[in-house]
């Protein structure tokens, strides 16, 4: 089933100049990038985005990291995009992510684990809406 997922290249990916290498993997796999832009999260947006982690031991570090620099956000489209992209990015903790996955190949620690991708249809819809207006997403 053709579907859309939301992907963010986190501040460490931009700082380390990995944007091209990561996008290349999605294009090589056969996905279409139907929306993309550069953003910088402010504290309010980061807190809204990571609401579920409020109160956790790593929350402050996570918010500081996510607001530390610019990011790339995109909408990736293709067959089973949500589950396939999650597989391609690898486990949340890069030390446990398999080699061959994006986190397995490019990261070693959290919260600076390079990339985020939606983990369900509901979160994909929510996250795409949070970052893109309808007319910023292109079908053709
Ligand atoms: N134990 C931890 N210590 C530090 N940072 C963490 C830890 N666990 C998660 N994080 C950070 O919070 C983010 C969100 O965690 P979550 O458990 O939702 O994982 P995820 O769904 O793989 O991540 P993301 O939402 O970024 O794709 C992680 O990607 C990572 O940057």
Swiss-Prot record:
One of the record's GO molecular function terms: ATP binding
A biological process term (GO) from this entry: UTP biosynthetic process
Active site: 116 (pros-phosphohistidine intermediate)
Catalytic activity: a 2'-deoxyribonucleoside 5'-diphosphate + ATP = a 2'-deoxyribonucleoside 5'-triphosphate + ADP; a ribonucleoside 5'-diphosphate + ATP = a ribonucleoside 5'-triphosphate + ADP
Record-level GO cellular component terms: cytoplasm
Annotated Gene3D superfamilies: Nucleoside diphosphate kinase-like domain (3.30.70.141)
Keywords assigned: ATP-binding, Cytoplasm, Kinase, Magnesium, Metal-binding, Nucleotide metabolism, Nucleotide-binding, Phosphoprotein, Transferase
Protein name: Nucleoside diphosphate kinase
SMART domains to which the protein is assigned, alphabetical: NDK
Subunit record text: Homohexamer.
Record keyword Coiled coil present: no
Cross-referenced PROSITE patterns: NDPK (PS00469), NDPK_LIKE (PS51374)
Xref: Pfam families: NDK
Role played: Major role in the synthesis of nucleoside triphosphates other than ATP. The ATP gamma phosphate is transferred to the NDP beta phosphate via a ping-pong mechanism, using a phosphorylated active-site intermediate.
Family, as annotated: Belongs to the NDK family.
Cofactor(s) recorded in Swiss-Prot or TrEMBL: Mg(2+)
Presence of keyword Cell wall biogenesis/degradation: no
Enzyme class: transferase
InterPro entries: NDK-like_dom, NDK-like_dom_sf, Nucleoside_diP_kinase, Nucleoside_diP_kinase_AS
EC identifiers of the protein: 2.7.4.6
Residues reported in the UniProt entry to bind ATP: 10, 58, 86, 92, 103, 113
Localization of this protein: Cytoplasm
């Amino acid at each position: 089933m053709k579907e859309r997922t939301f992907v963010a290249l986190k501040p460490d990916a931009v700082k380390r100049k990995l944007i091209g290498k990561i996008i290349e993997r999605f294009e090589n796999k056969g996905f279409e990038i139907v929306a993309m832009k550069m953003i910088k999260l402010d504290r309010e947006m980061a807190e809204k985005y990571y609401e579920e982690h409020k109160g956790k031991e790593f929350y402050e570090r996570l918010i500081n990291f996510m607001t530390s620099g610019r990011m790339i956000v995109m909408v990736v489209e293709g067959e089973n995009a949500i589950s396939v992209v999650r597989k391609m990015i690898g486990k949340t903790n890069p030390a446990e992510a398999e080699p061959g996955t994006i986190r397995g190949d490019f990261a070693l620690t959290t919260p600076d684990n390079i990339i985020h991708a939606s983990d369900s249809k509901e979160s994909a819809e929510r996250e795409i809406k949070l970052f893109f207006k309808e007319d910023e997403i292109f079908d053709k």
